[in-house]
UniProtKB/Swiss-Prot annotation:
Belongs to the azoreductase type 1 family. Its cofactor is FMN. FMN binds at S10, S16, K17, S18, M96, Y97, N98, F99. Binds 1 FMN per subunit. The gene is azoR. Keywords: Flavoprotein, FMN, NAD, Oxidoreductase. The lineage of its organism: Bacteria, Pseudomonadati, Pseudomonadota, Gammaproteobacteria, Oceanospirillales. This is FMN-dependent NADH:quinone oxidoreductase. One of its GO terms (molecular function) is FMN binding. Its EC number is 1.6.5.-, 1.7.1.17. It comes from Marinomonas sp. (strain MWYL1). PANTHER family: FMN-DEPENDENT NADH-AZOREDUCTASE 1, FMN-DEPENDENT NADH:QUINONE OXIDOREDUCTASE. Transmembrane segments: none annotated. It catalyses: 2 a quinone + NADH + H(+) = 2 a 1,4-benzosemiquinone + NAD(+); N,N-dimethyl-1,4-phenylenediamine + anthranilate + 2 NAD(+) = 2-(4-dimethylaminophenyl)diazenylbenzoate + 2 NADH + 2 H(+).
Length: 197
């Protein structure tokens, strides 16, 4: 049975265009994988704690020396990483907030970026260890895809690649506050999804 892990990060709920695109993909994926399982991780509905000095202290303390509080901190990332490792396919949906990704999604990235689990250091640089396929669903209000101020999609693509996820495709509904151009971008992204699944 194939497992799809979806990570949503928009605060707009079902009004979110990035989430609607992800829904479109999941619906078509389930039609082709009727026995498939979808694991949903909504980092806005259930936000993760942001990194603090205590977080770093817990991660860099040897396991046998961790306090109960430190063990609880590390367990957050352990659960997220286990979801990644168990998935066959990963999808990420995200809006653009002030030129970048939501802080809740950045917090997710911080928790799953763990040396020895999701990536490793080598003499030639870091190597990702997750080794899954992934898709990205992005939306923005005032900018169309490829705008120079886009620090959203490149950030997600770079991070996913860093931990070993192979981004098969990215579906972007840019310009959602721009009227017709935004509608066209959303419809084009939906059409691309129909072909990609």
């Amino acid at each position: 049975m194939a497992t799809l892990l979806r990570i949503d990060s928009s605060a707009s709920g079902e009004n979110s265009k990035s989430r609607q695109l992800a829904n479109e993909f999941v619906e078509k994926w389930l039609a082709k994988n009727p026995e498939g399982k979808v694991v949903a991780r909504d980092v806005t509905a259930n936000p993760l704690p942001h990194f603090t000095g205590e977080t770093l202290g817990a991660l860099f303390t040897p396991e046998e020396n961790r306090t109960a509080e430190q063990q609880a901190i590390v367990a957050i990332g352990d659960e997220l990483i286990a979801e990644l490792e168990a998935a066959d396919l990963v999808i990420v949906s995200a809006p653009m907030y002030n030129f970048g990704i939501p802080s809740t999604l950045k917090s997710y990235f911080d928790h799953v970026a763990r040396a020895g689990r999701t990536f490793k250091y080598t003499e030639t640089g870091p190597v990702g260890l997750v080794n899954k396929d992934a898709y990205i669903f992005a939306a923005s209000g005032s900018f169309l895809a490829g705008a120079p101020v886009d620090h959203q999609v490149p950030h997600i693509q770079t991070f996913l690649g860093f931990i070993g996820l192979n981004v098969k495709d990215t579906f972007i509904a840019g310009g959602q506050a721009m009227g017709e151009p935004g509608e066209d971008a959303f419809n084009q992204a939906k059409s691309q999804i129909a072909v990609a699944v």
